[in-house]
């Protein structure tokens, strides 16, 4: 058993099953019970509010109980007081178990392939596909953070030919895979268009970040919008089918307390150097 991934609020554990992984919340480092309570609330939120919006593209996941003794050696490195007898774990499908080679790895894109290139997987973070500012929120934020990204998922949505910028100088991808991606992006049911439409609808029905002055200004629709701005998408292609399979992860409920971070970031970007696109909406 080992940790194979860590974010700000979760760890991903390989427990020996090549098909499934355990996802454990570590958002609250003092008490296991606090993380357990959130996980129960989170999985209900995902199933009740997020999954119905995603056209069957949510990665398979469900809640299980794991005895604390089975996982204590790992969790004790992340949580001070393991004050429950069980750990509420989200069991989630392992989306990269058919691949072994990491081809590309940057802040918003990872790409994996099998040894014989019969399977290719893209792991993408499209972030703010819809934005209501005159500047590109993703590209402006990247510039503010000092990330020299040459591509933009909003631009990919507007023009599938932008895919070549995303792949860059990496020429290992099979032609059939590239063709399948281009065809997928021309379809209005592609995941980027789905997320764009959802983000646009929610943006128009929620309080702008610039107008949020306290936690009381953050409603459920705003939390859902921020969730959909932070998802990760897996797109898998295999040569046998010559077809794409899409899964979405990282659809967690955001704590309302994050409003201070959101408004601070908005203020920083407002006064920073902007990145504009001639075609952005």
UniProtKB/Swiss-Prot annotation:
Variant or mutagenesis effect after changing residue 10 to D: More than 95% loss of activity
The keyword Transferase belongs to this UniProt entry's keyword annotation: yes
Signal peptide extent: none
Subcellular location, record wording: Nucleus
Keywords per UniProt: ATP-binding, Kinase, Nucleotide-binding, Nucleus, Transferase
Gene Ontology MF terms in the entry: ATP binding; inositol-1,3,4,5,6-pentakisphosphate 2-kinase activity
Enzyme class per UniProt: transferase
Motif (EXKPK motif) on chain: 123-127
EC numbers on record: 2.7.1.158
Any one GO cellular component localisation term in the record: nucleus
Catalytic activity: 1D-myo-inositol 1,3,4,5,6-pentakisphosphate + ATP = 1D-myo-inositol hexakisphosphate + ADP + H(+)
PANTHER family for this protein: INOSITOL POLYPHOSPHATE KINASE 1, INOSITOL-PENTAKISPHOSPHATE 2-KINASE
Family: Belongs to the IPK1 type 1 family.
Name under which the protein is recorded: Inositol-pentakisphosphate 2-kinase
Organism: Saccharomyces cerevisiae (strain ATCC 204508 / S288c) (Baker's yeast)
The gene coding this protein: IPK1
């Amino acid at each position: 058993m080992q940790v194979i991934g860590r974010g700000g609020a979760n760890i991903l554990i390989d427990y020996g099953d090549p098909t499934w992984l355990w996802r454990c919340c570590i958002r609250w480092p003092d008490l296991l019970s606090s993380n357990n309570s959130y996980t129960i609330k989170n999985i209900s939120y995902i199933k009740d509010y997020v999954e119905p919006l995603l056209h069957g593209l949510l990665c398979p996941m469900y809640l299980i109980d794991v005895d604390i003794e089975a996982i204590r050696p790992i969790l004790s490195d992340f949580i001070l007081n393991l004050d429950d007898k069980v750990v509420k774990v989200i069991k989630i499908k392992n989306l990269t178990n058919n691949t072994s080679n990491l081809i590309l790895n940057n802040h918003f894109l990872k790409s994996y392939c099998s040894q014989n290139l019969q399977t290719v997987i893209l792991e993408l973070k499209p972030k703010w596909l819809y934005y209501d500012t005159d500047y590109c929120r993703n590209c402006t934020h990247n510039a503010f953070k000092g990330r020299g990204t040459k591509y933009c998922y909003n631009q990919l949505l507007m023009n599938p030919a932008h895919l070549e910028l995303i792949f860059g100088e990496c020429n290992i991808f099979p032609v059939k895979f590239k063709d399948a991606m281009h065809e997928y992006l021309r379809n209005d049911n592609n995941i980027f268009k789905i997320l764009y439409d959802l983000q646009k609808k929610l943006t128009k029905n929620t309080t702008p970040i610039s107008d949020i002055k306290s936690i009381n200004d953050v409603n459920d629709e705003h939390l859902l919008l921020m969730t959909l701005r932070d998802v990760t998408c897996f797109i898998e292609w295999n040569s046998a089918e010559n077809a794409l399979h899409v899964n979405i992860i990282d659809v967690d409920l955001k704590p309302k307390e994050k409003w201070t971070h959101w408004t601070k970031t908005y203020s920083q970007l407002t006064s920073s150097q902007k990145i504009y696109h001639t075609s952005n909406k």
